Amino acid sequence: MIADYEDPASIDAAIESVDAIFYQAQSMGDVERCNRQTETVRKAAEKAGVELIVVNSSMWAPDEPCGQYNFDGVLSMEEIMRAGPIPVVVFRPTLFMSNLHGDRIKDNLRKGLYRYCHKPDLASDWICLEDVAQFMVTALKKPELAGRKIGIGGPDRLTTLEVVDLVGEGSPQGARAIAEDARPA
């Protein structure tokens, strides 16, 4: 079933007769739009009698506003979803391993460069989307998780330089890190 967050009727049709929904909003960009879309989905879920909402926040989020636009935007999305009467479980993955599959990353790796907007010593928990999906499916069977915000990541917390070493092992020319500033120009 295809639904468009900007089209309430398509959301209504997509969640008709379901007990639970998985929700993933955009993780960066227009916070107001994301919040509006989240509220549209929440209201449709309330109207449809959905019993549980499982959210993939797509990234880390603070528990209180921190002053960083994207992180605070994810927090506001979570809080809008949690503001309704339906129990909500939020999963907060840190970084997706599939981020390394993008054309920009691959093109740079072919040149022996690893460019990512993290400092060399920043340690993060990378996770694959398949594992995120497993957490979300498991939440359907664990009602005691309702109301929780759960940070999830892979088994190893890796610094950017450790990721470069691992990625470089799979590249004939190796890889060296190029730290990029995460702030917009």
Predicted feature locations:
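Mobile cap/lid helix-loop segments that border enzyme active or cofactor-binding sites
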Residues: 179-185
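Glycine-rich, N-terminal phosphate-binding loop of Rossmann-like dinucleotide-binding domains
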Residues: 24-25, 57
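Cofactor-binding loops of NAD(P)H-dependent oxidoreductases
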Residues: 2-3
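Oxidoreductase cofactor-interface core, primarily capturing Rossmann-like NAD(P)-dependent enzymes
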Residues: 6-9, 16-18, 28-32, 44-52, ...
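Short, conserved SAM-binding segment of the class I
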Residues: 37-40, 44
